[in-house]
Amino acid sequence: MQTIEQQIANVIEESLTDMGFELVLVKFKGVNPKVVEILIDSLNSEKISVEDCTKASRTISAILDVEDLIEAAYSLEVASSGLERPLVKFENYNRFLEREVKITLKELLNGKTRYQGKIIKAENNKIYLKCEEQEVLIDYDLIKNANLVLTEEVFKKLLKQ
C-alpha cells in the first residue's frame, strides 16, 4: 500500500512536469493542522522563482481538492528544493554528475554510514562516489538520504549567472 506522500506524488507529478517542474519531494510536517510540504525544481536547470512556486501551488491545490486524498485540514507549502536539494530518485544522480553530495546509509558500508564526495557515475542501481582519493561504490537501495552540497565551485558559478 502506498503512503499518502506517494499517492500525492502520483496525482501531481505529471501536471508539474507539464509545467516544466520536477517534483522533488512530498512530506508531511506538523500535526494540527498538517502541513503538506512539496519541493520542486526546474527541469531546465533554471532557478525556481516565487512566481513558479505560486503557479505550482495553485495547480497542486486544485488537484488535491479534486482527488480528496487528505482527510483532515491541511496547509500547503510549495518551495524550491534549494541549493542543497535532496536526491530522492536514482535518475537524480546522473543529472548531478560531478557534483558534491552527502549520503547517509541505512547500514554500515566499510564501517561507515555517512559519505561525502563527487558523483562519478550512476548505473545499474549503483552510485560511484569519489571520496577524497578513493572511489566508493554504493548500492542505491542502501541510501537513507542524500543531499547536494553547496561548494565554493558551485557558489562561484551561481555568482556568474
UniProtKB/Swiss-Prot annotation:
Recorded GO CC terms: cytosol
UniProt GO BP: ribosomal small subunit assembly; translation
Functional note: Required for maturation of 30S ribosomal subunits.
Family according to the record: Belongs to the RimP family.
Keyword hit for Transcription: no
Taxonomic source organism: Rickettsia africae (strain ESF-5)
Pfam families (alphabetical): DUF150_C (PF17384), RimP_N (PF02576)
UniProt name for this protein: Ribosome maturation factor RimP
Statement: the UniProt record of this protein carries the keyword Cytoplasm: yes
Subcellular location: Cytoplasm
Keywords: Cytoplasm, Ribosome biogenesis
